[in-house]
Amino acid sequence: MNRHIAGTERKTKNLSHLVIVESPAKAKTIEKYLGKDYSVVASVGHIRDLPKSKLGVDVDNNFEPKYENKKDKAALIKELKKDAKAADIVYLATDPDREGEAISWHLAHVLGISPDAPVRVTFSEITKSGIAAGMSHPRTLDMDLINAQQARRILDRIVGYKLSPFLWKKVRRGLSAGRVQSVAVRLIVDREQEIESFEAQEYWSIDAKLLSASSRRAFPAKLTEVKGEKFKALNKEETDKVLAMLENGEFIITNIKNSTRKKTPAPPFTTSTLQQEASRKLSFNARRTMKAAQELYEGVEIPEMGAVGIITYMRTDSLRISDEAKAAAAQMIESTYGKEYLPSKPRVFKSKNNAQDAHEAIRPTIITLTPEKVKSALSGDQYKLYKLIWERFMASQMENQLLDTKAVDITCGECLFKANGYTVKFDGFTKLYEESKDNDEEEGGALPALEVGEKLKVKELTGNQHFTQPPPRYTEASLIKALEENGIGRPSTYAPTIATILDRHYVEREAKQLKPTSLGIVITDLMKGHFERIVDAKFTAQMESDFDKIEAGKADWVDVLGKFYTGFDKMLTKAEKDMEGKRVKIPDEPTDIVCDKCGKPMVIKIGPYGKFLGCSGFPECKNTKRIVNETGGLCPHCGGKMLAKKSKKGKPFFGCENYKDCNFMTWDTPLEDKCPKCGSTLFKKVGKQGQVYCAKDGCGYVRPADEDKKNEN
């Protein structure tokens, strides 16, 4: 008998137990541990879903879904049925969450397995012990989990299927709206409007650099009070008056407060915090992070161990850690760093109130597998992410950092200055890992030895002008944080949501920042005007809470959908009436480019595939052009201009303008510098230790990239 794993033929063997998982990689890892009496195959995700061509939900009959077998899974379903028929028992071992439970439920339906049969097994980690634990506790399918997934799927289908045609009629075909994506775009649009409407306010500070008798090094101090009131100067005139008061005054230390401050480690990762930290520290987008995490969970080939999952399940909002993992971490910390780095008792981190605590936090499954031990077995992305996860988890179980802090009050007449400094008394967990922040603020360094009553010399006294700053644009990291803090979406939705709003061109990246496009602003304004509840963060969070109640068995999924649909249907009817005969225009961006066909200005438009140049004389003139980003470099093969482009996955690369006749392309950046040997364009290799080289055939010129920096100094 032929069995099928992700389209790959497998050898025939007598089946006793069949285990079905989602992915081929996971199947391969699990089969290694289960032995010859088990065959493990993959469903490759969902095999049944709502139809693509119609709503597929009977809104008048308790929202009954009309599921269909997926057409592209027909051959696989046939193989799964054959395998299931030949097996003594079938286990459904899809992922341990709502989506995984729903996949198992659909598999049971298609394969004729009773939903009351104890065939459902789950693995929080793909290791020998994790698989053994899961296989020893089979259970029936959890209909509360399944109904929570069904409610979310059906609600999202209703919103998307009903709203999208409205947007097509009123704006442009091919647009979409969604329960989570529309709120995410609104957050970005609202932030952009805050930035645009922000009016900077001028203010001034007075800063001193002071010298003590015991030190040559000046230390900084800041004016905080004048005549017993907080110092606040809004212009240069006010600042100059205070500076005049300070001129020739004596700076005397009036108080010194020494204390010890504890700094505690960050908890181990949840899905959200992993995506945020990978964005900040590794410059990974959410999709890239989750791809690498999925691979680490499902299993990688480790020398002398074979395939093994080296992190726990990566879709979680829990901070819980098993006692076994804590004990293993404690042993590793003591043996590697010393007993002083081990706290007196293991740390316990409290999960947020709405966390689903079925899983642990994200952690390494085998603590002794340090990043360096597995580096040779992992891809670059896998290694970087595993190192981040391993170090964060280990640090979370280490002793606090201790800081000796010093706060100094310095008076000059009726003015009070303050200076703050610290020294590290004990490095603690920071020996291994420190959490990054979106906006790091530098703390003061060490202060010299000082005494109360000591007179200080003034090395420098300046008034400095400042302006209040608008709120920053969202990055992927800060957007994920905002979504989580507002209760919008679940751990599994952050990455696909961000990918969707970028792919739909509602949002674009500028460096690491997320900026709304004119299309995104138009759609958001339209949604706010006619579907306020759909783009309201509080309403969306309430829907997530309702799904959680369904999962907990505290709410009926049909009632939840009914309550939503009644209000939504009224909104849609009213919007169609209010917008009858009206269309919304997407504003064009003006350019200095002249149409080569009619002489009118070209403008930047947004189409289904992104931005392009179109003639402002449309529809009389239909001239369009691609937006070309020239680099200043020339192709080493044909001499054409090198253009900056993006792959289908959004990764930047460089290609020749004569791409139809010349196939030269590279990930490496073309420079304006010319090769000193042959005069061709030079390229800089990707990476921190990159080289500058000439790509001209037969030239061979190369130099270290850091030579450029040396020559600048």
What are the residue ranges of the model-derived segments?
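Conserved short loop/turn motifs at secondary-structure junctions
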Residues: L15, D95-P96, R172-S176, N258-P267, ...
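Basic, low-complexity terminal or inter-domain segments flanking catalytic cores
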Residues: N2-H17, T29, Y38, S164, ...
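C-terminal or mid-to-C-terminal helical accessory/interaction module adjacent to the motor/catalytic core
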Residues: I126-A208, N258-S259
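Metal- or metallocofactor-binding catalytic centers and their adjacent structured scaffolds
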Residues: K230-P267, E454
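Alpha-helical scaffold elements adjacent to nucleotide-binding pockets in ATP/GTP-utilizing enzyme cores
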Residues: T29-Y33, E79, A102-V110, G130-G134, ...
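Short acidic, hydrophobic short linear motifs in intrinsically disordered regions
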Residues: I253-I256, P265-A278, M305-M314, P470-A482
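Core structural elements
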Residues: R152-K162, V180, L210, R261-T273, ...
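Intrinsically disordered, low-complexity regulatory segments
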Residues: M1-Q150, K162, K236, D240, ...
